[in-house]
Structures are given as C-alpha cells and as structure tokens.
Amino acid sequence: MALVNEHFLKLPGSYLFSDIAKKVNTFKITHPKQDIIRLGIGDVTQPLPKACIEAMHKAVEELASKDTFRGYGPEQGYDFLIEAIIKNDFAPRGIHFSPSEIFVNDGAKSDTGNIGDILRHDNSVGVTDPIYPVYIDSNVMCGRAGVLEEGTGKWSNVTYMPCTSENDFIPEIPDKRIDIVYLCYPNNPTGTTLTKPELKKWVDYALANDTLILFDAAYEAYIQDADVPHSIYEIKGAKKCAIEFRSFSKTAGFTGVRCGYTVVPKELTAATLEGDRIPLNKLWNRRQCTKFNGTSYITQRAAEAVYSTEGKAQIKETINYYMSNAKIMKEGLEATGLKVYGGVNAPYLWVKTPNGLSSWRFFEQMLYEANVVGTPGVGFGPSGEGYIRLTAFGDHNDCMEAMRRIKNWL
C-alpha cells in the first residue's frame, strides 16, 4: 500500500490566489455585465521587450537547422546567460562570482520552494510576517513548519517576525537563534525595503548565529532609492550566510516565459549532525542534476537579451510604466484618506483597510461595490490582517479607472 506524505494534509485547502479566483468567478456569474479590474495577482500586462522577442525568434531558427540545433542543455544554465548575469547584475556593484555559483531556473518560485531539498526537515524557520505564501507552504510540505496552531494561524516551528506600521515594516532581529530565515526585499507583499545598514544587521546576525538567509530579490529592478541594496551580497560577509533568488518575471515580463536564477556561493556551508561543514553549492548542484533538466535554450536566449543595450532600455521603459502606475495609485488612494505603504521602490501597495474592516471583508466590499480586485493581506500571514495588497502591474488606464471607482465608492 502506497502511503501519502501526510504533511500535505496540513496545508490549507487551497492556495490563496485560488481562493481569490473562486470569489471573483462567483461575482462574475452573478454580475455578468460588471467590468472587473484586477489589481490582485502580481502578473504583468505589458508585452515582452522587443529585444527578447527577436532573440527568441533567432533561437527558434537555430533549432530548425541541423547545424545549429541544440538538445539537452546544462542543468545549471548556458554559459552565455550566466556570464551576462555576472557581468551585469553583480560586477558593477563590486560583487564577483564564478559561473559555477549561478544556477539558471524556470522562475524563482521553483527554487524558493525546492531549496529545502538540501536542508534537514527539522531546521527551525524564521519569516517576516506578512510573507509570500510559498515560503511557508513549502516548509509545511516537508514537515519543517510543525503544526498549525488554531486561533493564531501560525506554525509551531516557525518564528514570525511582524512587519507592521508600528515598526515601519522593519522586522526586529530575533533574540534567539534560528536556522533558516527568509527575507524578501523589496518586499512582497508590503512593497517596503531595507537600507544597507538595516540589511547588514541581518547578515551580522546570521554570521553570529550560523543562520542561513534565503534572500528573495525578485523585485530589485524596481528599486529607485540609492540607499536600498539590490543584492544581499552588497553586504560584506553575505556570501558566507546567504542564498539569493532572482527572477526575470517582473524585471522583463517573463511570468509566462519562466526564467530566473539562484546564487549559491561556494563559501556558503551548512553542518551535518556530526559537525562537518558541507558546501551548499555542491549539494544544490547535485540536486539540480537529478531533479532539473535545465531551462529551455529559447528562454535563456531571451533572458540574455535582457542585458543587451536595447533590452536594458526597453526594460527600463516598462518598469517606468509600472512605477508610474504605482505613483498614480498611491496618490489616488491617499487622496481618499487611506493609509498606503510601499509603491516607491516596489510595484506593490500595502493599503490599510478603513474603519477596522478585516482584509477579506474589505476585499469583498471593494469587489462588489467598486468592481476592483485586490489581495487580502491576511492571506500573507497573521500580521497582514487589516490590510490589502494592490499591484501596479495593470494597464495604465485600468489603474486610473480603479482609482476613480475606489474614490467614488469610499
């Protein structure tokens, strides 16, 4: 008799965004003539950069010829993309990596969810709260999160570090040792950031406590302020304590194309029960060679084009488009009297619900009365209760119309 992994049975019945989709579909069935504006799920709306499209066409033509055809590629990624990543994303910031420290993937979500494969199931975990649900759910699946505590919505083996308006959304350094800490900056869902001195405190904590930081930098391309780090490796010593995840999804509109990369420094080690230090780079490489067959050649050529002169200009234009949306939305929401956070160095706005409304109650009222979809903050963790997340990835006219509707509604 085959037995199931019963840790999966601990998970909530469905993923947050699936719940939202069900509620929206119910509304559409009962209100078929209403036009809904979706500012919930952080999916992009602008087309791929022209440079990337041209690179994909060229790659397709190569695969159509016997002389230039390619079959299986390296599990870690093609050298042409890895070299472009190192040259453009890290070298200008004084950060140096060898090609074997970069692992190309099919999107940051895969690796943030799979990185636990190389870590013991009984490591303690720390997360900022609210948080991207994948971090928690992937740890539940392997048994690392413990048991869900009724009433609190928290997992027993997870330390929650609240990020609220009371602490300016800056998590306090734990007063105890934690094995693994997840950090995402610019932050999803709050849209807030850490300065270099604030991030340095985390690196110092990790080095002092032998803690592994899993740093999600998927939104670094949206950073506008000079004092906000684009990479954790801008902090001295981070190579000894951190793995960084990057994505082309929001940088270049690759949400449907699927490509990102993970940085696992060779200096980074973790311990066995006997106290031996093991390079995580070696373990991750072994894991990838077994469970991953590499990202497609066509996709990687498109990602390489992101770093071309034309690609950089086109990407900047698209990012400016989304950040213009964020500015309009932030100003529009604040004009209605709502308290809004984020939207300056990130494409997310974290909105405090008025009159003490719960996240889901405000979500439903905004859907039914303004026909605008957001994401209930409580879906990102207990500290998200009383907030709702809006994204700036919509069409420009839709964002303006959404602000008009919300203003008239409130």
Curated annotation (Swiss-Prot):
E.C. numbers: 2.6.1.83
Binding annotation for substrate: 15, 42, 109, 132, 188, 293, 389
GO BP annotation list: lysine biosynthetic process via diaminopimelate, diaminopimelate-aminotransferase pathway
Cofactor(s) recorded in Swiss-Prot or TrEMBL: pyridoxal 5'-phosphate
Class of enzymatic activity (EC top level): transferase
Catalyzed reactions per annotation: (2S,6S)-2,6-diaminopimelate + 2-oxoglutarate = (S)-2,3,4,5-tetrahydrodipicolinate + L-glutamate + H2O + H(+)
Leader sequence residues: none
Residues that bear N6-(pyridoxal phosphate)lysine: 250
Pfam families: Aminotran_1_2
Binding site for pyridoxal 5'-phosphate: 72, 108-109, 132, 188, 219, 247-249, 258, 293
Pathway: Amino-acid biosynthesis; L-lysine biosynthesis via DAP pathway; LL-2,6-diaminopimelate from (S)-tetrahydrodipicolinate (aminotransferase route): step 1/1
Keywords, in A-Z order: Aminotransferase, Pyridoxal phosphate, Transferase
GO MF, any single term: L,L-diaminopimelate aminotransferase activity
Known partners and oligomeric status: Homodimer.
Function: Involved in the synthesis of meso-diaminopimelate (m-DAP or DL-DAP), required for both lysine and peptidoglycan biosynthesis. Catalyzes the direct conversion of tetrahydrodipicolinate to LL-diaminopimelate.
UniProt record similarity statement: Belongs to the class-I pyridoxal-phosphate-dependent aminotransferase family. LL-diaminopimelate aminotransferase subfamily.
Family annotation (NCBIfam families): DAPAT_plant
Protein name as annotated: LL-diaminopimelate aminotransferase
Annotated gene: dapL
